[in-house]
Amino acid sequence: KKVKTFEEKFAKYTGTKYAIMVNSGSSANLLALSILTNPKINKIQKNSEVITPAVTWATTVYPMVTNNLIPTFVDVDPETYTIDVKRVKDAINKKTSAIMPVHLLGNACDMDKLLKISKNENLSLIEDACEAHGCEFNGKKVGSFGDIGTFSFFLSHHITTIEGGMIVTNNENYYEYAKSMRAFGWIRELKDKKKISSKFKSIDERFLFTNLGFNMRPTEIQGAFGIHQI
């Protein structure tokens, strides 16, 4: 109940439809890219390139490698330490599938320009906002612009649950996959679990797995910490 309440409050806070809590910001990045590369989603193709800034934390990059993606590093704007939009344009080629900007130290990336590029080039846009809770670009919270936004609640961040993370999205399909994939690929939290389980009548729905997945589940204590601070 605490985790669910925190998720609902965080979605409202960021101006997004859905929020899914996980056990760390690193897990949030891994889950986001694992959803978009999932064969059933196939928004980002394996062995394609993802443009990301050279100034970031390691776990922005590791999930790319884990999902057989190729990180393409570009420099940052020295005024803000966020991704240099001109260099993003220069780095795009036929192998590029996504852009993963990082809102760093409370500074927002230029989301208007990045959105325009991603739409014109048909690229996915994943926002790493792990260090930018509450930051806004033109009055809109970061994390809410792209396909998926990620946040961290590590003890040194603006909101802390000691350890914890969140992904936000406006896409219901991504939300359903996130609920399943953060918990082993279970169907337990899915809205269509009865429909799915009816196809596998010999298997107890409590033990039905229909997806790739991880154990990224947060605890109720983490949820309570989050509620208190939101």
Q: Which sequence ranges carry the predicted segments?
A:
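Phosphate-binding glycine-rich loop
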Residues: 2-49, 63-67, 73-75, 140
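Short loop/turn motifs at secondary-structure junctions
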Residues: 15, 46, 95, 144-145, ...
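PLP-dependent aminotransferase-like
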Residues: 37-104, 108-129, 136
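Radical SAM/AdoMet-radical enzyme domain recognition
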Residues: 117-122, 140-148
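Active-site region of PLP-dependent enzymes
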Residues: 132-138, 145-230
